[in-house]
Amino acid sequence: MYQKNYHIYFVGIGGIGMSAIAELLLSLGYRVSGSDLKLSAITQRLASCGATIFNGHRADQVKDVDVLVTSTAISKNNPEVIEAAERSIRTIPRAEMLAELMRIKYAIAVSGAHGKTSTTAMIATILNQAGLDPTVVVGGLLKSIGTNAHHGKGDYIVAEADESDGSFLKYAPAIAAVTNIDLEHLDFYKDIEDIKDNFVKFINSVPFYGLAVLCLDNEHIQAILPRITARYTTFGLSAQADLAARGIRFEGRRGYFTVVHGKEVLGDITLNLSGKHNISNALAAIAVALELKVDFSVIKEALEQIEGVKRRLEIKGERNSITVVDDYGHHPTEVKTTLAAVREGWPDKRVVVVFQPHRYSRTKALFDEFTRAFYQSDLLFVLPIYAASEQPIDGIDSLKLCNGIQEHGHKNVICVKDFESCLSILSDTLEPGDLVLTLGAGDVYNLGETLLEILA
């Protein structure tokens, strides 16, 4: 991409994935504009970087545009998409734009059903600590830099490879890290076999000089290993992983473990994050860093001071000895993993969860799994389903989910109709020493922030 005079327009520019690419293009000198139905801190940042931001989608906003970028969240009936077609403006998916940017540098792509953002952040932090100043495109706000994109001067680009719609097959990374494979995104994939087939294609796209970094703890990755033709290494908590963690323990919100590479003990790591899932993510990042010849002492220092990503076990605050934590988890596996990490990090607290289901299609497809995901919570509130542009599905709602959770043995489940009623009950229920975990990929984090204001 060398046409710096291009005017690139993003439909839905405030999205976490779209905004990262937009910010990177701005830093490269392109003219960038875009629209979103809701202005936010993200769109404000883009405006401060030089982007023209429109509130709402209107056809007249794309009249002098060279390229229109969309995502799967944007309908074909969007007025800007229709206008672009009528004007013969080239329209491309977000993934294609990211793929073009990744061609500029030595590309490291991180994919998987869970842990992509955290792992990408860890790799970026380690490479930055090593003085390599990577370009970063990540699906979350990095606490260390306050944004989801960074245009580095170094030779590397580290980016999330989103598998949700198969678009990660557009990338051609030199290093491909896969954190796990899980049953997800069934609005696009037929079944788990279809998902595994796509991951095999992604992994085998790694060139002969590259490397695939694969989690041996995941049963679906275990299943596809015989089909992998790319050079690969494995990581995990398993004794059979090429890069493994030993002697895992937690103290407070920090994890401690020893890294073993084959038969060689590389050394001890103190991870400034809680949860075994984050140790697994750290192992993936360590494997990538070792492939790039980063010294272990640098890796150790980076992980000890890593700040993490917003909305990933993010401590929002504490009032009256009540702690409020927020997490993006919205899949049953993520729910269980996050609750386990909370129990490890805060073992003595009563855990009160406020869960906002995300998408009707996901709730329907994974309904049985959701009913058995919350046993580690002491008290559970379930909010209405966050539609995320979907239409309701008959027979799928939060009340049915609550009933299912209760039928599967959870004794303390409350179905609430909105934020206001949830906050009212919380105010009367919470006690000093409690931990409130807001959980979901929608806007449930706002409830946690409001709760802190009420408790002040």
UniProtKB/Swiss-Prot annotation:
InterPro entries assigned to the protein according to its UniProt record, in alphabetical order: Mur-like_cat_sf (IPR036565), Mur_ligase_C (IPR004101), Mur_ligase_C_dom_sf (IPR036615), Mur_ligase_cen (IPR013221), Mur_ligase_N (IPR000713), MurCDEF_pg_biosynth (IPR050061), UDP-N-AcMur_Ala_ligase_MurC (IPR005758)
GO cellular component assignments: cytoplasm
Gene Ontology molecular function, alphabetical: ATP binding; UDP-N-acetylmuramate-L-alanine ligase activity
Any GO BP annotation: cell wall organization
Compartment annotation: Cytoplasm
Family from the record: Belongs to the MurCDEF family.
Classification via PANTHER family: UDP-N-ACETYLMURAMATE--L-ALANINE LIGASE, UDP-N-ACETYLMURAMATE--L-ALANINE LIGASE-RELATED
Physiological role: Cell wall formation.
Entry protein name: UDP-N-acetylmuramate--L-alanine ligase
Lineage of origin: Bacteria, Pseudomonadati, Thermodesulfobacteriota, Desulfobacteria, Desulfobacterales
